[in-house]
């Protein structure tokens, strides 16, 4: 069985793992059926506040 020769510090470990995350694909986007703006899937639209046909974030109250 392979064993580490020396303890790997948290920063060195995280630097190694960051290389994998940097190479991942860019996030996919879908168009909002309500306003047509590009948005992330399975999340409320940042432009109009709709998700799955319902208004879940009232944009008028925030402004």
Curated annotation (Swiss-Prot):
Pfam families, alphabetized: Ribosomal_L32p
Gene Ontology CC: large ribosomal subunit
An example molecular function term from Gene Ontology annotations: structural constituent of ribosome
Entry keyword Transport: no
Keywords: Ribonucleoprotein, Ribosomal protein
Composition bias type Basic residues, residue spans: 7-18
Family annotation (InterPro entries): Ribosomal_bL32, Ribosomal_bL32_bact, Ribosomal_zn-bd
GO biological process, one term: translation
The keyword Ribonucleoprotein appears for this protein: yes
Disordered: annotated span: 1-27
Family, similarity comment: Belongs to the bacterial ribosomal protein bL32 family.
PANTHER family found in the cross-reference section: 50S RIBOSOMAL PROTEIN L32, LARGE RIBOSOMAL SUBUNIT PROTEIN BL32
HAMAP family in the record: Ribosomal_bL32
Protein name: Large ribosomal subunit protein bL32
